[in-house]
Amino acid sequence: MAAKKSPIIELFRKFYYQIRNHPRVYVHITNRRYKIKESLFPKDPLISEIINSLRQNGIAQVDVSNLFGPKKLDSLTNWVREKESELEIDKKKSFFLNYGIFCPPFRADLNSNPFVQFYLEKKFLQIATAYLGYIPLLHTVEIRKTIPVGDAKPSASQKWHRDPEEKRILKIFLYLSDVDLGSGPFTYIVGSNPTSKGPWSRRFPQKLPHGVYPDANLVEKFTQPGDLLEATAPMGTIIFCDTAGLHRGGYATKNERIMATGFYTSFKYSEPPPGFTAKKVKGQVSKLDEVREIVSGN
């Protein structure tokens, strides 16, 4: 969440971000160096289906084996098992235990970390680039275990919220354990992504560059059957989501949840990873190998 400034600065920032985040300005001016033609990507029916679902609903789900084959999950779950003794409590959200949080540049991790390799897969980069409209930065890779909190009240990201800064944000979640209602499933209001055309796209809008945490009772007041997607699903489920839409998750009451997250954003994101300086891209990028290098921050 972007840090708040003085009232005068906040007023200026509001005006600035209204212009900056207009869809045409954001893609064609702010991120013009990073534009890439979607037509350059190979045609894949499943990838097209995911992109279309993101555009219409803000969310899509698929089993990891459908995208990457039956063996992809093995290396990821093996890594998690090896790190089980090294878990650390998250400094900001005490209901999380961290297996690892990784930021670019990923030079040291590319050959040794299966999750960094996973989130730099070409199919993910095709989806992220096509949905966002420009070559994104893989901002963060997180692997976390959610601790059951019993009857404690939801806090932080367990509450309904929209992420800050962008009108389009892509996060790709991977369930590394079976997730039921007691495990704190990722929950999304379908069609609440700001660039969709449904009524939820305009309810409880972001206060750019900040997000928003609307009152749960007000959200429930407007919720109709079919609006809510509670992503209860087996291990190996991938969730693609525009988290500028209304969502919550991690409110585990009975069972642990293990989940990886890849966060794709603009190189112009106002809160870059620690110590990162965006690489300047000259001209049109047309090869996915080059896209992969750029997205990794190397």
Sequence positions of predicted segments:
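Active-site region of the double-stranded beta-helix
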Residues: 134, 162-165, 176-185, 191-193
